[in-house]
Amino acid sequence: MAQKTLLIITDGIGYRKDSDHNAFFHAKKPTYDLMFKTLPYSLIDTHGLSVGLPKGQMGNSEVGHMCIGAGRVLYQDLVKISLSLQNDELKNNPAFLNTIQKSPVVHLMGLMSDGGVHSHIEHFIALALECEKSHKKVCLHLITDGRDVAPKSALTYLKQMQNICNESIQIATISGRFYAMDRDKRFERIELAYHSLMGLNHTPLSPSEYIQSQYDKNITDEFIMPACFKNYCGMQDDESFIFINFRNDRAREIVSALGQKQFSGFKRQVFKKLHIATMTPYDNTFPYPVLFPKESVQNTLAEVVSQHNLTQSHIAETEKYAHVTFFINGGVETPFKNENRVLIQSPKVTTYDLKPEMSAKEVTLAVLEQMKLGTDLIIVNFANGDMVGHTGNFEASVKAVEAVDACLGEILSLAKKLDYAMLLTSDHGNCERMKDENQNPLTNHTAGSVYCFVLGDGVKSIKNGALNNIASSVLKLMGLKAPATMDEPLF
């Protein structure tokens, strides 16, 4: 088995048994009908733990393409950190240990919620308890959310933090994320949060009383004014500080204010030394230890093909170009040797339901051209099912599927003539469910399975699997050995 191969990603076209509001089911799709009758196919998981996301969370194009290209599950920061903490690995984490061992006082700061977008309260609690085991005094600097969770939910999360408080662990400050997590260089906001860290803006109220006093002024969690509580005298020289958010964009400014030598946002208290660490890499210019460094993704599908001196072409329209280049290549921006990239402009319309065919025809022409040139691997993304599905327009989504189906017909026909193998799947679903339980338009991705079809010499059946099984399957069609880092193929 060694064939030139097509990897076709039909973005946003998923599997769903029910036909109600299912644009894929209701579309006229002779090519799909032919594939169902003549090609082996299976179902592929695209969400939750199968792609490294939290259990039950819908997949997305970035994660999906990363998983496809890597050929293995790349756990996202939230899941990776949670698994590490569940396995009690923090006690052996060098960045964590080195940071807390430098001072009897450890300051922990981060977003106090279970929203899972920037942080998770379980991480906050786990770090505090591990510091306590090392006989440290722990100062908690709580950032209230109200954006990724309900606007007035802080008291619920506060109770969880108070449950671990004792003589060693105390709540030192509180601030709404509007102030402590600015990302737009509005340093007048950061300055207020910074002042509370320094022991300014004292309130005589308890943390719960203070939150309630803000609610009484119609101030919700996101906008709670920064304050510090009794018995907290501010950060001191030679103390340790860990910011527990795993997402970097809204953590940079406050960490810069605390630790960067070059800072012009506002006048700061001068420290000889603070021992700062961050949960994940926040900025390439930051010198601070990182508890959970970025995972290097090597031996991706594109890299392996390049190592064998074979040619490849990655094709998509604007909306999905980054996904078939940067993301599918494991976060590598520069093309590999013999890797050609074709960018087709997406139509300039306000919303894609106005032109559900998008640029699928132009994408198809580029694919056909590469096939005629004999390119060894062609990776192509059809954006229609996802981008039109996001509009919530059922009729337009049906047309989007029909447009993709027509394009697939041309590609499949030429593939058979030129002896190309083909693997067709989706990175996640969308257009197969266009209304929610209340009959309102549903515009988000679905948390379900997608189809996988294979055309290849000797391939009679394929197993159910997940996106991490795609790369090794493509390499097998090409007659190439998959690296040990990749998971097993589907056949």
Swiss-Prot record:
Disulfide bonds: none annotated. Binds 2 manganese ions per subunit. Its EC number is 5.4.2.12. GO terms for biological process: carbohydrate metabolic process; glucose catabolic process; glycolytic process. Substrate binds at H118, R147, D148, R177, R183, R247, N248, D249, R250, K320. It is an enzyme of class 5 (isomerase). Its cofactor is Mn(2+). The keyword Metal-binding applies. It comes from the Bacteria. GO terms for molecular function: manganese ion binding; phosphoglycerate mutase activity. Pathway: Carbohydrate degradation; glycolysis; pyruvate from D-glyceraldehyde 3-phosphate: step 3/5. One of its GO terms (cellular component) is cytosol. It catalyses: (2R)-2-phosphoglycerate = (2R)-3-phosphoglycerate. Mn(2+) 1 binds at D386, H390, H445. Mn(2+) 2 binds at D11, S61, D427, H428. The active site is at S61. InterPro entries: Alkaline_phosphatase_core_sf (IPR017850), BPG-indep_PGM_N (IPR011258), Metalloenzyme (IPR006124), PGAM_B_sf (IPR036646), Pgm_bpd_ind (IPR005995). It holds the Pfam family iPGM_N. Belongs to the BPG-independent phosphoglycerate mutase family. Catalyzes the interconversion of 2-phosphoglycerate and 3-phosphoglycerate. This is 2,3-bisphosphoglycerate-independent phosphoglycerate mutase.
